[in-house]
């Protein structure tokens, strides 16, 4: 299924440019780099929506990001090919459609990434250290979770200081019971 690897909603990314021409991600990427300070994130013009023949992806007007309707997605890859920033990735659905992934593609160093987007991966490496299955690598200041190695333990999600690691289609976590010892920091 297609996953959108950007969580830079309108609230998370400061606007730095405004363009009143044709709304196209391809045009935005080639002419002016988009309206936000993140040079890696979603451009928000919807080329992915136009490319989808199955009506499986739509732009959320509140967040400015595309959302995938998993019940309609055939994982054909048309949306991924249409994205000039390569933020859409085709991933296996996993057990009960559960997935854990890094919802960011920003390769800037921590402080620069955080300035461009408040929920960007800062490359701290906490997720790499806590993963018991060696499913996470850190390359070019960005964490990546290998879907073939990930066992969905979600320890990485717990330690991510930016909230960039997303776990989809899992039941809610059980609340901690009173007197339960806090988990050690990684």
Show which residues each predicted segment covers:
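Ferredoxin-type iron-sulfur electron-transfer modules and their immediate structural context
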Residues: 1-124, 128-130, 159, 163-186
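Strongly charged, low-complexity linkers/loops
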Residues: 126, 132-144
């Amino acid at each position: 299924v297609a996953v959108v690897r950007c969580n830079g909603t309108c609230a998370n990314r400061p606007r730095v440019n405004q363009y009143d021409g044709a709304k196209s991600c391809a045009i935005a990427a080639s002419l002016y780099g988009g309206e936000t300070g993140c040079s890696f994130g979603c451009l928000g013009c919807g080329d992915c929506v136009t490319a989808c023949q199955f009506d499986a992806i739509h732009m959320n007007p509140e967040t400015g990001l595309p959302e995938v309707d998993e019940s309609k997605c055939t994982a054909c890859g048309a949306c991924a090919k249409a994205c000039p920033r390569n933020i859409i990735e085709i991933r296996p659905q996993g057990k009960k459609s559960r997935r854990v992934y890094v919802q960011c593609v920003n390769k800037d160093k921590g402080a620069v990434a955080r300035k461009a987007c408040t929920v960007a991966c800062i490359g701290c490496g906490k997720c790499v250290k806590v993963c018991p299955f060696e499913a996470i690598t850190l390359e070019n200041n960005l964490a990546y979770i290998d879907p073939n190695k990930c066992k969905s333990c979600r320890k990485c999600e717990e330690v991510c200081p930016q909230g960039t690691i997303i776990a989809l289609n899992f039941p809610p976590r059980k609340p901690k019971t009173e007197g339960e010892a806090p988990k050690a920091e990684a």
